[in-house]
């Protein structure tokens, strides 16, 4: 499994930009996944940017190098190409426009390079992109930690297993909120805090299949058990789950090693066991 971070994407875009032709007057995004690469390329070259709908309507944004009335060649960009469905849909929508249109994708499934005019790197599946891991296929099949992933971790003084902790459960700042239903939430929060946890999840519209909490009756009992990562790994062994997203580097490595499956660590932004 391959993991591409924002940082790696930006590095790849800088390299790709050097190879792309210089006679491109504007860059067009295939929403939403094409928004990042297309806008980065447009900003780098200081040329006009638009979306597929915008191109049809003749609406462009930004860019001082090319006036809107002198746009002759447009690069339509997506972050990746697998089946080519999005590219085909864009071609159909843009067919007939009185302008030269070329197509590109940063990452392309090997063998499908012919579907675009320009591509940067062949990339087989499975692969995960940082910018959409919480918004599609992988989230649907993932186990997610709560503290450190969905919301911030409690600081020391908040973690008193009492009134301060209950305030934290109500007011925890969100971090990564998925836009699709996730397979399971697997947390070391105690089972007795389920009502507060479910209330917070409803507040931020987090949709999930299961909420699996720690069975210990107290913080001290959970510490004595010392099975923070072990229990997560045992749950993750279920073949229904294809990815675990964990905040703690130490736990992420243990979960991956025990379950023999990939774990994405949000603290380090690395994929272990991929």
Language-model segments: which ranges?
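Substrate-recognition "cap/lid" segment bordering the active-site pocket of phosphatases
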Residues: 194-241
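PRPP-associated nucleotide enzymes
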Residues: 1-143, 149-172, 192-195, 199, ...
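Short active-site oxyanion
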Residues: 23-27, 182-185, 240-243
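Acidic beta-strand-to-loop metal/phosphate-binding motif
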Residues: 74-78, 184-188, 242-248
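Substrate-recognition element of Asp-dependent hydrolases with the DxDx(T/V) motif
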Residues: 176-198, 212
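Residue-level recognition of beta-strand->loop/alpha-helix junctions
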Residues: 53, 105, 187, 212-215
């Amino acid at each position: 499994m391959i993991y591409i971070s924002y940082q790696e994407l930006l590095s790849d875009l800088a390299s790709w930009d050097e190879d792309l032709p210089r006679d491109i007057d504007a860059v067009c995004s295939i929403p939403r996944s094409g928004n990042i690469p297309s806008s980065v390329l447009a900003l780098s070259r200081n040329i006009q940017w638009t979306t597929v709908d915008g191109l049809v309507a003749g609406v462009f944004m930004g860019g001082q190098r090319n006036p809107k009335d002198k746009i002759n060649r447009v690069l339509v960009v997506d972050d990746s190409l697998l089946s080519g469905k999005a590219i085909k849909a864009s071609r159909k929508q843009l067919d007939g426009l009185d302008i030269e249109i070329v197509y590109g994708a940063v990452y392309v499934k090997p063998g499908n390079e012919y579907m675009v005019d320009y591509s940067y790197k062949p990339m087989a599946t499975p692969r995960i992109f940082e910018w959409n891991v919480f918004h599609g296929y992988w989230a649907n099949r993932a186990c997610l930690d709560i503290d450190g992933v969905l919301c911030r971790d409690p600081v020391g003084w908040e973690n008193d297993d009492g009134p301060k902790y209950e305030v934290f459960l109500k007011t925890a700042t969100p971090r990564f909120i998925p836009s699709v239903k996730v397979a399971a939430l697997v947390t070391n929060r105690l089972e007795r805090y389920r009502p507060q946890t479910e209330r917070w999840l409803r507040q931020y519209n987090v949709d999930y299949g299961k909420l699996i909490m720690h069975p210990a009756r107290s913080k001290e009992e959970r510490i004595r058990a010392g099975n923070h990562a072990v229990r997560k790994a045992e749950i993750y062994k279920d073949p229904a789950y294809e990815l675990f997203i964990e905040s703690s580097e130490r736990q992420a490595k243990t979960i991956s090693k025990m379950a023999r499956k990939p774990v994405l660590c949000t603290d380090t932004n690395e994929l272990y066991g991929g």
